[in-house]
């Protein structure tokens, strides 16, 4: 076996790239990059009824969005069926596999007998050493592996440790169905061998498959790749992650406003640790990642923790990068807000200018976009209930009073507008908040916003005065 590490991510395109699959891809990618090896991508599309092009596209898009690039061309398993069949025939010719003519009724009876006797259902090997001349007429056989019946099958797993199975408990699995289609077990082994895979990293729900596949590798005289079966992801309640926990596809996390770097960082900490470090740059992840530091216990997905981490990434991101990230989600979230991509240049400039104040409190790009509502809202602004309450007769009176002071400013900035509003409040004998709150309501339509005077600076003199005029027209 070559010393170069080759991992593979092998999703089935029967649905979108879910969060567990994304973490599996990340671990494969990190291990490959850490060791200077390669990560290959194989689409296991042998289930023709459930595999869809939409799911394939979603998987590829999800990986690309997460920044997980693969090496070489994508391998499609279904296209390799002839190769899989040829290997089954090789095993048959070598006496390491055999034709089985057991009927569906016989197999059903085996299962029923096993249940009645309180043992796991398994094929009883009735055609293992039987003369093919005894084959019943009109029955198309399957090809079964002639698996060892004594001793143990052992997997030295990088995460689970030494795992053993008594061979007497593992039956002769089907390699080729009666219609000539290869089974998943055979296809995976042949593809992993032909692709030069040296390290398999996948969920621990595949652990039993490891025994089956190891037997096929051995029957073919091929090296068995090293294996690492990582724990599944559970919800906060300890149950296996499902849609009721919000186990969404990666594309949904994108549209919810999570940054790919933040999601990568969160996913790497689900089951893997490096001391007590929580925040990792991509370079730090690659340098530190080690399969020996992956735990065996199921990791719990915590949306609040993800949101907090995403907020940290937002606060430390460059302002222009955040605006660019917002533009990428506008095709899905923009129409309901009256926005489309690309943003108009003047709005884009205003967003970048406003970003230092906007990003301090936002935990997602959606929150960021909604807190910037005042920049793209159409005049006259729609007021929420709290803002409307602030613009009572008294509030509108304050607006009418402060407006001439603002109009007279020779220059317009956060500092100059703050000075003017403070001066007006003092001359009017009222507190700053009694002027600032109606101003905020008139300029943003809400009672919470980024710092008021930053808002005024970004809106500019003309737009600020126009919005004040909408709420407190001059007589």
From Swiss-Prot:
Monomer. It comes from Methylobacterium radiotolerans (strain ATCC 27329 / DSM 1819 / JCM 2831 / NBRC 15690 / NCIMB 10815 / 0-1). This is Glutamate--tRNA ligase 1. InterPro entries: aa-tRNA-synth_I_cd-bd, aa-tRNA-synth_I_codon-bd_sub2, aa-tRNA-synth_I_CS, aa_tRNA-synth_I_cd-bd_sf, Glu-tRNA-ligase_bac/mito, Glu/Gln-tRNA-synth, Glu/Gln-tRNA-synth_Ib_cat-dom, GluQ/Sye. CDD domains: GluRS_core (cd00808). Its EC number is 6.1.1.17. A motif ('HIGH' region) lies at residues 11-21. Pfam families: Anticodon_2 (PF19269), tRNA-synt_1c (PF00749). One of its GO terms (cellular component) is cytosol. A motif ('KMSKS' region) lies at residues 240-244. Catalyzes the attachment of glutamate to tRNA(Glu) in a two-step reaction: glutamate is first activated by ATP to form Glu-AMP and then transferred to the acceptor end of tRNA(Glu). It is found in: Cytoplasm. Belongs to the class-I aminoacyl-tRNA synthetase family. Glutamate--tRNA ligase type 1 subfamily. It is an enzyme of class 6 (ligase). GO terms for biological process: glutamyl-tRNA aminoacylation. It catalyses: tRNA(Glu) + L-glutamate + ATP = L-glutamyl-tRNA(Glu) + AMP + diphosphate. Keywords: Aminoacyl-tRNA synthetase, ATP-binding, Cytoplasm, Ligase, Nucleotide-binding, Protein biosynthesis. GO terms for molecular function: ATP binding; glutamate-tRNA ligase activity; tRNA binding; zinc ion binding. ATP binds at residue 243.
């Amino acid at each position: 076996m070559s010393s170069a590490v080759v991992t593979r991510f092998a999703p089935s395109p029967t649905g979108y790239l879910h969060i567990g699959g994304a973490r599996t891809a990340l671990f494969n990618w990190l291990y490959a990059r850490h060791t200077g090896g390669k990560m290959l991508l194989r689409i296991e599309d042998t289930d023709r009824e459930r595999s869809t092009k939409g799911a394939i596209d979603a998987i590829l898009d999800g990986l690309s969005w997460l920044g997980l690039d693969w090496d070489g061309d994508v391998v499609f398993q279904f296209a390799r069926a002839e190769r899989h069949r040829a290997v089954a025939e090789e095993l048959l010719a070598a006496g390491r596999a055999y034709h089985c003519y057991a009927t569906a009724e016989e197999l059903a009876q085996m299962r029923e007998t096993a249940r009645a006797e309180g043992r796991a259902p398994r094929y009883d090997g009735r055609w293992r050493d039987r003369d093919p001349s005894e084959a019943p007429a009109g029955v198309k056989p399957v090809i079964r592996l002639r698996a060892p019946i004594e001793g143990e099958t052992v997997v030295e797993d990088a995460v689970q440790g030494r795992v053993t199975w008594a061979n007497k408990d593992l039956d002769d699995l089907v390699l080729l169905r009666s219609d000539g289609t290869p089974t998943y077990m055979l296809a995976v082994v042949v593809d992993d061998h032909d692709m030069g895979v040296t390290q398999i990293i996948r969920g621990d729900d595949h652990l039993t498959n490891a025994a089956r596949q190891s037997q096929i590798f051995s029957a073919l005289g091929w090296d068995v790749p090293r294996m690492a079966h990582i724990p599944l992801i559970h919800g906060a309640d300890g149950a296996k992650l499902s849609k009721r926990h919000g186990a969404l596809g990666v594309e949904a996390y994108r549209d919810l406003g999570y940054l790919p770097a933040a999601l990568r960082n969160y996913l790497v900490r689900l089951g893997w640790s490096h001391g007590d470090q929580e925040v990792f740059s991509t370079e730090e992840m690659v340098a530190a990642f080690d399969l020996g530091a992956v735990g065996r216990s199921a990791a719990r997905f915590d949306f609040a923790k993800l949101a907090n981490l995403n907020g940290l990434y937002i606060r430390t991101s460059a302002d222009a990068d955040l605006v660019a990230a917002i533009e990428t989600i506008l095709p899905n979230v923009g129409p309901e807000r009256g926005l489309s991509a690309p943003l108009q240049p003047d709005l884009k400039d205003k967003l970048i200018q406003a970003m230092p104040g906007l990003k301090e409190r936002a935990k997602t790009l959606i929150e960021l976009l909604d807190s910037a509502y005042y920049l793209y809202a159409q005049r006259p602004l729609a007021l929420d209930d709290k803002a409307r309450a602030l613009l009572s007769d008294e509030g509108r009176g304050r607006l009418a009073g402060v407006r001439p002071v603002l109009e007279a400013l020779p220059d317009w900035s956060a500092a100059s507008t703050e000075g003017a509003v403070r001066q007006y409040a003092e001359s009017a004998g009222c507190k700053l908040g009694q002027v600032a709150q109606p101003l905020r309501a008139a300029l943003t339509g809400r009672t919470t916003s980024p710092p008021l005077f930053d808002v005024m600076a970004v809106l500019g003199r003309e737009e600020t005065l126009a919005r004040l005029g909408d709420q407190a027209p001059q007589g």
